[in-house]
């Protein structure tokens, strides 16, 4: 019989590796969140999770959406359910939006611009999420 904790640790490790290899910086402490979010420019925050729609839709969208003429200056991620304090701190910046994972938040100069929430990810195709993210990049980001 498979050890559930061993299995989940492997799922979490793979989820972390997938988003980091897509160019996102992991924020694992509240201090790291504050440091990252106070930078000038645009920041895309991917709120990672172990659910199926994170692996099948959100992380692929996170990886592919940034291959676009206009994109955020900074790409970061927090892991809901894993790095709880960092995720809680990040959510303090997402004023007006309920906690949701997976999700994406677009910040400009540390202020929330918009979000793609779980209900806009779950049950959708990765290309739909990519198109939504890129429309936000088009409106809010500069060519890099």
From Swiss-Prot:
Coiled coil (residue ranges): none
GO BP: any one term: cell redox homeostasis
InterPro entries: BrxB/BrxA
One Pfam entry name: Disulph_isomer
Domain of life: Bacteria
Similarity annotation: Belongs to the bacilliredoxin family.
Protein name in the entry: Bacilliredoxin BA_4378/GBAA_4378/BAS4061
Species whose genome carries this gene: Bacillus anthracis
Source taxonomy: Bacteria, Bacillati, Bacillota, Bacilli, Bacillales
């Amino acid at each position: 019989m498979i050890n559930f904790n061993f299995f989940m640790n492997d799922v979490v490790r793979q989820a972390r590796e997938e988003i980091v290899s897509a160019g996102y910086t992991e924020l694992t402490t509240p201090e790291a969140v504050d440091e990252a979010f106070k930078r000038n420019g645009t920041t895309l925050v991917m709120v990672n999770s172990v659910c199926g729609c994170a692996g099948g839709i959100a992380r692929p969208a996170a990886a592919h959406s940034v291959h676009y003429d206009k994109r955020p200056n900074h790409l970061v991620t927090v892991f809901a359910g894993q790095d709880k304090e960092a995720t809680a701190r990040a959510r303090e910046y997402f004023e007006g939006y309920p906690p949701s994972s997976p999700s994406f938040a677009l910040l400009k100069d540390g202020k929330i611009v918009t979000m793609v929430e779980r209900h806009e990810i779950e049950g959708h195709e990765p290309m739909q999420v990519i198109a939504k993210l890129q429309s936000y990049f088009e409106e809010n980001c500069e060519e890099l």
